[in-house]
Amino acid sequence: MKKHRIFKRILIVFLCLAIVGVTSLFIINGYVKSSGKDRILTVEKAAELDDVDCIIVLGCQIKDDGSLSHMLRDRLMRGLEVYEAGAAPKLLMSGDHGREDYDEVGAMKNYAIENGVPSENVFMDHAGFSTYETVYRAKEIFEADKVIIVTQEYHLYRALYIAKQLGVDAYGVSSDLNTYAGQSMRDFREVLARCKDWVMCIFIPEPTYLGEAIPVSGNGDLTND
């Protein structure tokens, strides 16, 4: 009987902790989403902004043969649309190039050049391993204080929240040009990612790599391999 009471109390404690945890997830998720809603603009409205340093296109997975995924292609198409509208003079491609045989940013820059953007106007952040690291490095390495971030809308909320917490004046343009397979799972993972980056923005850890400044006002070819 005594063991039964102890088990019951333990179960109640775990249930209470679970309720608190789930409630916290939803509160933080809602807070992160709401903090950047008014900074998501159309291409036309983004082009009306003044003194934007660069357009940041956030990377995502490329295929085994190095070609672009549908999601990444849409980000690049929208990023180039914002660039061609005159919203900013430079593009910053940020993604994962942590291995010699996997290069998101190289594929992204090649796409921009193939579509008429001068190579010197396209910067690459080879160590943009996460959204948090991308925004941190945009400010500290590329000296970008005012930016337009391009990615799918579900991802924009978190990127804009991080930018706000790190002191970057950021606006977003959505690249939802299609529907994407597996989006329900991405939406679920994004809830957890928002909570993780909410914590990151409290402690402000340094990214995996820092280094010498490469001002985005200069020549993007300085970031070539």
Q: What are the functions of these language-model segments?
A:
Residues 2-45:
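N-terminal type II signal-anchor transmembrane helix
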Residues 99-104, 171, 193-200, 217-222:
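A general structural signal for short secondary-structure boundary/capping elements
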